[in-house]
Amino acid sequence: MNPPILRSLHPARARGFTLIEMLVALLILAVMSALGYSTYRAARISASRAQESLARTREIEFGLRIMLQDLAEAVPRPIRDPLGTTRRPSFRGGPGQTTLLELTRSGWSNTAGMQRSTLQRVSYALVGDKIQRSYQTVLDPTSTNQPVVQDLLTGVTSITLNFLDPNQAWNTQWPPPTLPLPDSEWTRPIAVEILIEFKDWGKIRRLVEVAG
């Protein structure tokens, strides 16, 4: 009879990773790293877009607020043209003019205590896809005075203004052609409707009452 085979009392030694196991582990690590980077990149892009959207919202809100404030503080004060021969109406706007809107407004802040009027002449024009706001440093400018120009709104496709007269009729031009002198130099509309179409925001409508 053959003697029984004695089993080793020592446990089997741990085997090392095989080449296939190492490749699988590396593949899993690579996939997890790629997923982690993709998630991080997506989060960065999302945060960047959110910041851009917020900045755009602030730009549009600021531009509209300036426009509405100018209209709300319009006053009946015509100005002399640069040559001093004629007067421009205190409020004018509409298609077919050099500027979309031009008016005299009150409330020009003077924190520096300069010797100037608190009335200000401002105008708006659509230049390319930008609405520009301009103002003169003096109320009755001469040919040597240069306006201060600011890009107020960008990405603009179109802008339309409508003016409500005292008879509750809407006009696309102000002063209305039927309004005789000198009334046309001093009369302001009761309200102004602003329709602006943006490339990214679509159409925005604002209605503002002009100071009485």
Residue map of PLM features:
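Short linear sequence signals and composition-biased patches located at protein termini or domain-edge surfaces
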Residues: 157-212
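N-terminal single-pass transmembrane signal-anchor helix
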Residues: 1-2, 13-40
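Structured surface patches comprising rigid loops and adjacent beta-strands/short helices at the edges
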Residues: 77-80, 151-163
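Extracytoplasmic beta-strand-rich oligomerization domains located immediately C-terminal to a leader/signal peptide
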Residues: 35-142
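A short, polar/proline- and glycine-enriched secondary-structure boundary/capping micro-motif
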Residues: 113, 141-150, 172-173
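Short, mixed charged/polar active-site loops
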Residues: 117-121, 147-149, 202-205
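Short solvent-exposed loop/turn micro-motifs enriched in small/polar/acidic residues
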Residues: 115-117, 143-144, 154, 187-189
